[in-house]
Amino acid sequence: MHIDLVGSANAPAVVVTQNDTAVVLFRGGNSVRNAVEEQLARRGAQTVELVADLRTNPKTACTLEAERTLPAAEMAVNTAQKLRCTPALVEMLRTRNGCLVRLTVGNRQFAVVNGTVELAKQVTVQWLMASPAKPDAVQYKNVLALRSYDWMDNRKELAASISLRRHGGLKTE
């Protein structure tokens, strides 16, 4: 199982692959779409079970092909969707000015924030997949990021990928 951040540091996509299946969390942009397609090919993903489009006000359509799509823009404000896919359980919460996605893989949880997400209580996860969006709604222990962002403490080494082993081990790159 692999989780990779790809594309632009301003709008990184998340590609989750397990064997030949994948889930993609997409934030838009042609260059990011191309990076996603390259990463899917690199990881040998033949089936994209889900593309979750995290944009609440997209300027262009998401053209990534998938068995299912979950566009945040089509969700009512303050609603959630939960989908079980081969690589992960995907939970998307749409707020007024953004969305939060929590991925559950085995006993590990990962969060992605797009836009501004305000919650009464923070969501607690092991890993935050970072973007320019300040993750005030998320309490996390570890970070995956393409680069350091203004809201971050000065982190010296950042990994953009994580490989999860079947029996609990992991490796960041």
What are these regions (language model features)?
Residues 1-173:
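Non-globular, low-confidence helical/coil segments that flank catalytic cores
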